[in-house]
């Protein structure tokens, strides 16, 4: 007959064996812990504070490539810099794009003669004023290098899916990203004198926006301030007291200034259009 001491020892041994059958030590050294080895061979989960590795946008297990603001797979093993952008193809033209801060802009002005639905935008005609929305085009034979000036009536009817006319707030964010309205102008303007008159002050084009001194079309269709001014429309309006005319906010850059200013302009004028990518 087993003594009480031997019986206790036997029961304890059975209990210990039973516990050993149920317990285990995870890869982090924790009994019954929840850590495990992922596909990259790293101990994750449980109390490690680590999450398992995933396949990046370049197809690399545990890679560090990611989609940037232009939805382009960059960094990691791609050998593509983080600020790279793919071109936008629209209506037979390939547009350069550029990342500035958290925004993606066209790096050149819009050059379409069609509305978004595919219908043709009427050319401006001094003898037949078109109320449906005018497109003003400089008289150049080379379609690749023509300058397009759009009336405000065309806004929101000429942009491809995923892109839009910028808001006043979009432009304010752009200006702030570049240090404020007193120094942002030079960073946006094309350097040199191919399109700008002397002195084209402080122009560096350091962010790749490549604003050209195109001037604008006045209410009569005449080209004004070519070489001395660049501006583009926003979609936001300003109602002027005692005026029947609608004014739209525009970004204005000048040949003799480093400023980048938001100023209201008449909807009857013709300005270039610069698109921003939807968030």
Write out the residue ranges for each language-model feature.
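Primarily marks secretory-pathway-exposed extracellular/lumenal segments that are disulfide-
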Residues: 2-98, 138-139
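Conserved positions within compact, well-structured domain cores
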Residues: 70-71, 76, 82-279
């Amino acid at each position: 007959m087993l003594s009480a001491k031997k019986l206790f020892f036997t029961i304890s041994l059975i209990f210990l064996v039973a516990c050993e059958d149920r317990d285990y030590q995870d890869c982090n050294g924790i009994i019954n812990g929840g850590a495990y080895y992922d596909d990259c061979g790293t101990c994750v989960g449980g109390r490690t504070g680590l999450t398992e590795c995933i396949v990046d946008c370049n197809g690399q297990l545990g890679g560090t490539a990611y989609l940037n603001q232009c939805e382009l797979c960059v960094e990691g093993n791609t050998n593509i810099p983080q600020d790279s952008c793919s071109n936008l193809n629209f209506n037979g033209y390939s547009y350069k794009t550029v990342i500035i801060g958290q925004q993606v802009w066209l790096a050149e002005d819009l050059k379409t003669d069609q509305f978004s639905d595919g219908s043709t935008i009427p050319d401006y005609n001094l003898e037949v004023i078109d109320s449906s929305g005018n497109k003003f085009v400089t008289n150049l034979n080379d379609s690749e290098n023509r300058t397009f000036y759009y009336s405000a009536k065309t806004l929101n009817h000429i942009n491809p899916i995923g892109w839009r006319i910028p808001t006043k707030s979009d432009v304010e964010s752009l200006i702030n990203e570049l240090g404020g309205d007193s120094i942002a102008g030079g960073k946006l303007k094309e350097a040199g004198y191919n399109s700008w008159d002397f002195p084209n002050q402080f122009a560096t084009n350091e962010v790749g926006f490549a604003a050209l001194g195109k001037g604008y079309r006045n209410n009569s269709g005449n080209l004004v301030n070519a070489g001395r001014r660049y501006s583009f429309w926003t979609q936001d309006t300003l109602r002027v007291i005692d005026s029947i005319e609608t004014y739209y906010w525009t970004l204005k850059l000048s040949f003799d200034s480093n400023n980048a200013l938001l100023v209201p302009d008449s909807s009857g004028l013709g300005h270039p259009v610069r698109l921003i990518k939807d968030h």
